[in-house]
Regions:
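Short, conserved clusters of charged catalytic residues that mark active-site
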Residues: 16-17, 40
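Short secondary-structure boundary/capping segments
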Residues: 21-23, 69-70
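Rossmann-like dinucleotide-binding domain for NAD(H)/NADP(H)
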Residues: 28-173
Length: 173
């Protein structure tokens, strides 16, 4: 699930993933929420897990964060502290978009290039693509940290280490 949070209007997304949503699923998907916590009804998601309507879930955004539902955290395959957009690439892109919006607002129409820092090791040697991807980011590490100490949600998020996205690397077997 990746959608903005819209509370009112013709197409609200608040609790978009609710009991009705999960009941309508034809297969048992792996449910991923990386948008806004309130787009998913936590209790409906837990019931969907109980009923086998979904195979498993990966949650990066939570209702009521930083006070996250501990039952859901413990039942998630992967649970992270709202860090999906925390890569150096994501931050550079957001900075560029902000600069361009400000430039447009003031009638300057500037085009900006904001480059993230180079990764410490640009070439990744791995036997498979999965192994290569896990070497640059393993979500189970973040999940373990959050599950070990959920009260540190904001600390884990605030002190998040710099990482680059896949396109910053060259993979070789």
């Amino acid at each position: 699930l990746h959608t903005p949070l819209v509370r009112e209007g013709k197409y609200p997304t608040f609790h978009l993933a609710d009991e009705k949503f999960f009941a309508s699923l034809q297969r048992r998907p792996y449910f991923i929420n990386t948008s806004r916590g309130e787009t998913t009804d936590t209790h409906a998601l837990l019931r969907a897990l109980d009923k086998g309507q979904i195979a498993q879930c990966c949650i990066d955004v939570w209702e009521h964060e930083p006070h996250i539902d501990l039952e859901l955290l413990n039942r998630c395959d992967i649970g992270t502290p709202h860090i999906a957009g925390y890569s150096a690439d994501g931050k550079a892109n957001a900075t560029r978009m902000s600069l361009e919006a400000l430039s447009c607002h003031f009638g300057l129409n500037g085009v900006f290039e904001v480059l993230p820092p180079q990764p410490p090791q640009k070439v990744i040697h791995a036997a498979s693509r999965a192994e290569a991807l896990l070497s640059i980011y393993n979500p189970h590490i973040d999940s373990h940290a959050l599950k070990t100490c959920p009260s540190h949600f904001e600390i884990l998020r605030g002190d998040y280490p710099l990482r680059r996205e896949e396109q910053a690397y060259e993979f070789r077997s």
